[in-house]
C-alpha cells in the first residue's frame, strides 16, 4: 500500500529543521548505501552527530503521533533515518532497500520520504516507484510524507534545478506482510466510520473482534 501523509510536522518544527539543514554539514551519501546501491547513489547526507540525532527524534515523534501513519504502518521501530540533499545533477538510480539495517538488524518493512522542499523550488528529483508493469512518479508538497513498501524497486530522478531536501527512513512493522497491513487498515477505517455514524454497534464490536484477533495472529 502506497499512501501520503500530509502536514506531518508543526510549522515551527518544519521551519527549524529547514533552517538547521541550510547551515549543516553534509557528507557523501554513498557512505550509508549497500555495496550495490553505491553504484547508483549520487547525493549528500547530513553528517552523523548531535544535530542529526536531534532532527531524527523530531521526525520520529511527529510520525508516531500521526493517526494515519500509526493505523496504516503499525510501527514497532522507526529506524535508520537520514536527511538527504540532492543538488543539480544528483540522483539515485534504481535500487532496493536493504532488508535488514543497522547494528540491531532492524527489518525494513516500510519506507518513507518526508519532503522538506516545496515542488516549486526544484525541478526533477521525482521519486519513482516501479511496479511489475508500470511505474509512478511522486513529488509531494512540502511537509508531506510518502509511505511505501520497502520491497519495491525505486529511484530518484536527476535534479535539474534547485535543491531537493528530504528525510528518508524505514519502519519495522508489528505486521511484516504488506497485504495483512492493508487488511487491518481497511478494517480500522470501516470500524471508525461505523462509530462516527452509528456509535458502538454490534457491527462495530464484530470488526473490533476481528482486528484484535488478526493482530494476535499476525503481530510479532
Swiss-Prot record:
Q: Which positions does UniProt annotate for Fe cation binding?
A: 95, 97, 154
Q: What is its EC number?
A: 1.14.11.-
**Recorded GO MF terms:** 2-oxoglutarate-dependent dioxygenase activity; iron ion binding; L-ascorbic acid binding
Q: What class of enzyme is it?
A: oxidoreductase
- Pfam families, alphabetized: 2OG-FeII_Oxy_3
Keywords for this entry? Answer: Dioxygenase, Iron, Metal-binding, Oxidoreductase, Vitamin C
The entry's free-text remark on the cofactor is: Binds 1 Fe(2+) ion per subunit.
> Which InterPro entries does this one have?
Oxoglu/Fe-dep_dioxygenase_dom, PKHD_hydroxylase, Pro_4_hyd_alph, Pro_4_hyd_alph_FE2OG_OXY
Q: Give the required cofactors.
A: Fe(2+); L-ascorbate
An example GO BP is: DNA damage response
User: Which domain of life, per UniProt?
Assistant: Bacteria
Record's keyword annotation contains Metal-binding:
yes
Q: Does the keyword Oxidoreductase apply?
A: yes
Q: Where does 2-oxoglutarate bind?
A: 164
Q: Which residues form the Fe2OG dioxygenase domain?
A: 77-173
Q: Which PANTHER family match?
A: PKHD-TYPE HYDROXYLASE YBIX
Q: What is this protein called?
A: PKHD-type hydroxylase PCC7424_1929
